[in-house]
Amino acid sequence: GIQRIPAGEVTSQFRIWFNPSLQSQIFMVPAIVGLLLSLVTLLLTSLAIVKEKEIGTLEQLIVTPIKSYQLIAGKLIPFVILGFVSVIIVLTGMKFIFKIDVKGDVIFLFASSFIYILSTLGLGLLVSTFSKTQQQAMMLAVFAIMLPLVFLSGFAFPVENMPEIFQDISVIIPLKYFLLIIRGVILKGAGFAEHWQDGLAMF
């Protein structure tokens, strides 16, 4: 006859990928790259250009024979370089202090950083056009742009856990996509194939 074999016990176990020890710094430290880039490029750009307005040198630069794009490039290139220096410093500290290595495509990481720097420089220019003093620029940059960038980007907690209206607003937040890229590259070993759409969304 047919011999019945008793079924064995089935046990389920949770398996946590990419951060099995549940250390908060592994999740938060890569995101500091995005936060630092936002602070350096957005605030310094808006303050530097508004300062030129206050002391009257911006008008003098405008009437010079240089073209407008040359003037803008001359003002923004130093902040692009400063942004890349900030990325290198944070990645170095992340490796030697927190023992977190970049597992994915480093070239894609720096290319994404460049795109994000361009987007925040644009926001800094936008702030400078609406500000007449450095104090106005600081207040506008921090309260109108930086706070939404941080709280709606998934920096501290997942966007998926937010109310639906905030999830809809987060679609226009460039830091959200940059954090997806940087966490994917550093923690998951991802690259261009997984995050090219996030890179396009930052434009």
Map each language-model feature to its residues:
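Transport-system extracytoplasmic interface segments
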Residues: 1-44
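Residue-level hotspots within the lipid-embedded alpha helices of multi-pass solute transporters
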Residues: 19, 32-36, 44, 48, ...
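Short alpha-helical transmembrane interface motifs in multi-pass membrane proteins
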Residues: 26-30, 38-43, 73-78, 104-112, ...
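A hydrophobic alpha-helix feature that marks transmembrane segments and, especially
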Residues: 35-57, 125, 129
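Hydrophobic alpha-helical transmembrane segments that constitute the membrane-spanning cores
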Residues: 42, 74-98, 119-124, 128, ...
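Short helix-to-coil transition segments within interhelical loops
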Residues: 51, 60-68, 130
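Selective transmembrane-helix segments that form parts of the transport pathway or gating/packing helices
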Residues: 66-93, 110, 114, 199-203
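Membrane-spanning alpha-helical segments of multipass transporters and channels
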Residues: 101-203
